Amino acid sequence: AHAANTVEVQEFMISPAGAPSFKDGIRWCTEVFHALAALLKERGLATSVGDEGGFAPDLGSDEEAIECILEAVEKAGYKPGEDFVLAMDAASSEWKSATKGEYLLPKSGRKFTSAELIEHWKQLCEKYPIYSIEDGLDEEDWEGWQQLTKALGDTVQLVGDAFFVHN
């Protein structure tokens, strides 16, 4: 993970999918960044940043992080799912347990099989405007990646960073 907090997903990212130009997209992202900083300050949360420049507040869950980001998108005057979509870097290779096909989430202690983790990603993608998941499964979970691709590959960009770097 890139920050010490209670969120399992390593990084959440925004993409200005509705921006008419690159220049506008950069401006939009900057506006959301500042709206998120203000929102975190209002809630008494830290606005320190992680290793790659993103905020690292101590939030209770991945969903709380997503909801904060979407609230900041709205606060900046944009529409989630239309003007902005989300991406996540799960870095789930770090969750691999000693049992093949099992994931142990380090902060919550929850356990998932590959199938359960795929269902978790599917539910998040149905509930929120998520367009990309990076490292949604462990780099050695070949069968899981096939199932993840079947479940989400037509609607969500699946990025295999660790999968391709280490295989």
Where are these regions (language model features)?
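Fold-independent oxyanion-binding glycine-rich loops
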Residues: 1, 12, 16-17, 52, ...
